[in-house]
């Protein structure tokens, strides 16, 4: 048992250490020195092997010793090996390799082969990335070749090469992560593994970095999002998510094209940021010597085109909002918006039900999907896209949820109503950052008491006019508009309304928005004189609709983070502390029909 009288040793004339502590430190230093010596010896061994042509067969290691190096050492050795190939006249980056058949097609075409089959009369060329390399004795090497989301085994046998030296030379220079081309015959091993049996393997592009093993995978989210290429190499489920995203966009295009809509493109930089209540990004145009705003929504341009006689238009593209980043928000995001002359919001509800229910059935095979809002380990929810979707009236349902009678909707623009809503938020502990306008207070209450009830698709309808400066007034309920938002799993994915086409009323609402902006609401709209002038030429009865592609993709891929469905999400620089993922973002109280 150690005692306080344990003898001490002075180190560098300063700190006093016990003999046990000194012994521990000396042992640790010795162990570190041995490790460094071993790595140095291994590095020199690999460099020597690189500098001279190998004259022995590959052993079971097949470069496995290199896997024990730290990443920097591995990169150095691999880079020098590739440079040596260039010196000896071997091009590690050839211009072209003709591929006869994809890996997927190869598997479909030859999976019927029997164990032990070898089609020597069929020669094909395939290509892919090496994910595993393993030797069986000195004359047989297996590779796992991956690409297109599938795996094909390469069974390299020395007897199929011109000489054993050629077999050794070709296979000794290949490592995990390399992209190779393989020319050979289809076959199956005795155990029934479909393989291509090569006559020749060509290095097409070496991987200079140590590739993580598939067994362990790439799980660190920071690395996955910043190095999406590596994420795609190692995680096939990521590839599948973006395939689903592509299918969603393809389905929407096909659906709208069949309804006679024309796909259009509108400016992404604007003098005035219109079409939604949101904070814009500002850029500068050198030639024009003026600030421009990245678009927050394309709505106003679309309605101008309807004025011009293009009755059905749609656009799938990026929007930019200078707001926070969280699990469901990214500063740039993708929407689909369409505008349909001679239609109202009732028509668009039917179109929305038909589009989304058909899409979900087409992509997943069922109207019902399972979603985990808190991640794979969290609670699972069943989301049912079977039409018709649930519909609720915003103000009526809010009164039921709050257990209070709100002022008449015709009085929602008064200070008295604002004060009542303010008091309710205080009493219900609902946070609303300033400015505490009627529209913002209503939006927070709806989020707290109505949106949380929307698991399966639910239309929240008939928003107050004060929340919807671009929507047409309700034909039978004063103070309300003909607008709906579609919520799924408590999140808005669609926004639509019968469009306001009275130029006088539109100008009045723009002026009210200008007052809100002057009062400190930096998300309020600007007055767009060009749009008001266009309305004066006559906008036919029109309905407009917008949907967030990113959020819909989250639901259909069971992803609870928007970064999972964006190939290259917004990230803070690595030298800054990453806090963006936890930032709370106020939901926009109105929108173009965009999310």
Swiss-Prot record:
Post-translational modification: Phosphorylated on a serine residue after mast cell stimulation with immunoglobulin E (IgE).
GO biological process: diadenosine tetraphosphate biosynthetic process; lysyl-tRNA aminoacylation
Comp. bias regions, Low complexity: 580-595
Residue positions binding ATP: 321-323, 329-330, 492-493, 548-551
Compartments where located: Cytoplasm, Cytosol; Cytoplasm; Nucleus; Cell membrane
Residues reported to bind substrate: 275, 299, 337, 339, 495, 499
Note: It is likely that the same gene provides both this cytoplasmic isoform and an additional mitochondrial isoform. Shares a bidirectional promoter with Terf2ip/Rap1.
Protein name: Lysine--tRNA ligase
Residue list for modification N-acetylalanine: 2
Oligomeric and partner information: Homodimer. Part of the multisynthetase complex (MSC), a multisubunit complex that groups tRNA ligases for Arg (RARS), Asp (DARS), Gln (QARS), Ile (IARS), Leu (LARS), Lys (KARS), Met (MARS) the bifunctional ligase for Glu and Pro (EPRS) and the auxiliary subunits AIMP1/p43, AIMP2/p38 and EEF1E1/p18. Interacts with AIMP2 (via N-terminus) and MITF. Interacts with TARSL2.
Species assigned in the record: Mus musculus
Keywords attached to this entry: Acetylation, Aminoacyl-tRNA synthetase, ATP-binding, Cell membrane, Cytoplasm, Ligase, Membrane, Nucleotide-binding, Nucleus, Phosphoprotein, Protein biosynthesis, Secreted, Transferase
Catalytic reactions on record: tRNA(Lys) + L-lysine + ATP = L-lysyl-tRNA(Lys) + AMP + diphosphate
Disulphide linkage map: none
Compositionally biased intervals (Polar residues): 48-58
Name of the encoding gene: Kars1
Modification Phosphothreonine occurs at: 589
């Amino acid at each position: 048992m150690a005692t306080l009288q344990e003898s001490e040793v002075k180190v560098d004339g300063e700190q006093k250490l016990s003999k046990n502590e000194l012994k521990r430190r000396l042992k640790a230093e010795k162990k570190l020195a041995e490790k460094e010596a071993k790595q140095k010896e291994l590095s020199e061994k690999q460099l020597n092997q690189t500098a001279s042509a190998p004259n022995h067969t590959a052993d079971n290691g097949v470069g496995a010793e290199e896997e024990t190096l730290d990443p920097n050492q591995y990169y150095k050795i691999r880079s020098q090996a590739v440079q040596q190939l260039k010196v000896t006249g071997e091009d590690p980056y050839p211009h072209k390799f003709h591929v006869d058949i994809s890996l997927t097609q190869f598997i479909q075409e030859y999976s019927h082969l029997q164990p032990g089959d070898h089609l020597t009369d069929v020669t094909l060329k395939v290509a892919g990335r090496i994910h595993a390399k393993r030797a069986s004795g000195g004359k047989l090497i297996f590779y796992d070749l991956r690409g297109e989301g599938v795996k094909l085994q390469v069974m390299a046998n020395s007897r199929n090469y011109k000489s054993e030296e050629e077999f050794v030379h070709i296979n000794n220079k290949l490592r995990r992560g390399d992209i190779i081309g393989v020319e050979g015959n289809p076959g199956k091993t005795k155990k029934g593994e479909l393989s291509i049996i090569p006559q020749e393997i060509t290095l097409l592009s070496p991987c200079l970095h140590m590739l993580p093993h598939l067994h362990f995978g790439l799980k660190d989210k920071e690395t996955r999002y910043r190095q999406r290429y590596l994420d795609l190499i190692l995680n096939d489920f990521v590839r599948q998510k973006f395939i689903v995203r592509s299918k969603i966009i393809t389905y929407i295009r096909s659906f709208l094209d069949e309804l006679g809509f024309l796909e259009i493109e509108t400016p992404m930089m604007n003098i005035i940021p219109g079409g939604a209540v949101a904070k814009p990004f500002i850029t500068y145009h050198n030639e024009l010597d003026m600030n421009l705003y990245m678009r927050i929504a394309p709505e106003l341009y679309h309605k101008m085109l309807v004025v011009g006689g293009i009755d059905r238009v749609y656009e799938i593209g990026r929007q930019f909002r200078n707001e926070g980043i969280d699990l469901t928000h990214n500063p740039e995001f993708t929407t689909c918006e369409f505008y349909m002359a001679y239609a109202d919001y009732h028509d668009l509800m039917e179109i929305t039900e038909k589009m989304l229910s058909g899409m979900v059935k087409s992509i997943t095979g069922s109207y019902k999907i399972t979603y985990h809002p808190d991640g794979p380990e969290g609670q699972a929810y069943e989301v049912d896209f079977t039409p018709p979707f649930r519909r609720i009236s915003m103000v009526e349902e809010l009164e039921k949820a709050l257990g209070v009678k709100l002022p008449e909707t015709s009085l929602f623009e008064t200070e008295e109503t604002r004060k009542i809503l303010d008091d309710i938020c205080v009493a219900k502990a609902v946070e609303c950052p300033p400015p505490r306008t009627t529209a913002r207070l209503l939006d927070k209450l709806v989020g707290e008491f109505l949106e949380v009830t929307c698991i399966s698709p639910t239309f929240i309808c008939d928003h107050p006019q004060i929340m919807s400066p671009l929507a047409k007034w309700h034909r039978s309920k004063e103070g309300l508009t003909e607008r709906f938002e579609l919520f799924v799993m408590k999140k808005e994915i669609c926004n639509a309304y019968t469009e306001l086409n009275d130029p006088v009323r539109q100008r009045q609402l723009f002026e009210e928005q200008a007052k809100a902006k002057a009062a400190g609401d930096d998300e309020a709209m600007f007055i767009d004189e060009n749009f008001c002038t266009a309305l004066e030429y006559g906008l036919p009865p029109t309905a407009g609709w917008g949907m967030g592609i990113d959020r819909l993709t989250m639901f259909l891929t069971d992803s609870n983070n928007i970064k999972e469905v964006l190939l290259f999400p917004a990230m803070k620089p690595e030298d800054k502390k990453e806090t963006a993922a936890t930032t709370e973002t106020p939901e926009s109280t109105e929108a173009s029909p965009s999310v």
